[in-house]
Curated annotation (Swiss-Prot):
Biased composition (Acidic residues): 270-282
Listed GO CC annotations: nuclear speck; nucleus; PML body
Physiological role: Transcriptional coactivator in the bone morphogenetic protein (BMP)-signaling pathway. It positively modulates BMP signaling by interacting with SMAD1 and associating with CBP in the transcription complex. It contributes to the BMP-induced enhancement of cholinergic-neuron-specific gene expression.
Listed transmembrane segments: none
Pfam families in the record: PNMA (PF14893)
InterPro entries registered for this protein in UniProt: PNMA (IPR026523), PNMA_C (IPR048270), Znf_CCHC (IPR001878)
Family: Belongs to the ZCCHC12 family.
GO molecular function, one term: SUMO binding
Subunit-structure text: Interacts with SMAD1 and CREB-binding protein (CBP). Forms a protein-DNA complex through its association with SMAD1.
PANTHER family from the UniProt entry: PARANEOPLASTIC ANTIGEN (PTHR23095), ZINC FINGER CCHC DOMAIN-CONTAINING PROTEIN 12 (PTHR23095:SF18)
Record-given protein name: Zinc finger CCHC domain-containing protein 12
Amino acid sequence: MASILSRMGNSRGQNSPLPPWAHSMLRSLGRSLGPLMASMAERNMKLFSGRAEPAQGEETFENWLSQVTAVLPDWHMPEEEKVRRLMRTLRGPAREVMRLLQAANPCLDVEDFLRAMKLVFGESESSVTAHSKFVNTVQEPGEKPSLYVIRLEVQLQNAIQAGVFAEREANQARLHQLLVGAEMSTDLRFRLKSLLRVYANEPERLPNFLELIRMIREEEEWEEAFIHPKRPRRSQSVERALSPTFQSSPPVMISSIDCNVIEIDDSPDDSDEDVILVEPDDPPLPSSSAGPSFLGRAVSEDQVLVIESPNIFEIQAPSTSSGAGRKNNNNFGELRRARKRKHTVHCSHCGEEGHSKETCDNESDRGQVFENLIITLQELTHTEERAREIFGEAIGLSELH
């Protein structure tokens, strides 16, 4: 009747409500037509006899059960009246069996009625199979508890349809099998056991399927975040350690034993050339493994040239104009090509810039030579101190890594 009233109200428009007498008439009509409509629906229900071969107008047990399950939500009446209507749909052996059951249990409700029908007329083999599949459903290796619960729910619904469990026992059966067949944290297991113990006589208050899934998912997310955090793979750690961003730039040491003139070129289209002069007659530079001893004593600036490199990896040794250059192998690995820098070359004989002692053609007096030499030594001393600071920082960073 409520649907009829709403339809009539919508047809007349929101601004023109029905008069009170119309509402009263429709209520009376609804009270009169209600039993008639229920009786018509009852007459349209199929019959079930329980015989092996259904007669004309009868249905198999599966079709009868599907029809009853569909109409039960529309039956707003006491349990006794529902059972009475269900009895009217039975014929033959099915009616006799349920009459005996009802005589033995006068307080029989609809749920117990349907459960008894499933046990008697349903396929007994399917009931046993459904129950066996449910109790033998356990968590597989590597399977998350949340996925196991979803797989378990399928078997539980099959068992309920086969009459193994009543609908009101679903939460209890689900929770019990979860504790038996799943691996979970100690905290979650304790909470679920406590719920099962507290609500042993009130299974409807136990968490249903969706609530149980939510509890398990929260526990899994907490474990992933705090107990089993994702660790970077070894290859990622090595790549991060080798990244130029996380490394500082140690000095590149070039010994004078290899070449006289070093030409450093950044790119093919760079027109500037840096020429670095190194004295060839000086002793070779000590190896990089003797870093502390190298810092502990004075080294002539004619023996070593220190260049600040922007990166310590994959720097290629510079090519020499005389063709005698070789790769500089040290503790820092294969070095990248150094960036170009301007270095002023002084002649130790005359003190002028732009040429070396071997190519010097100037003849100056000894006083001027010594004065120029003192100036050159002062400049090189400042360069040496700077080189020691840079080399010390590079040694410290290499020890940290």
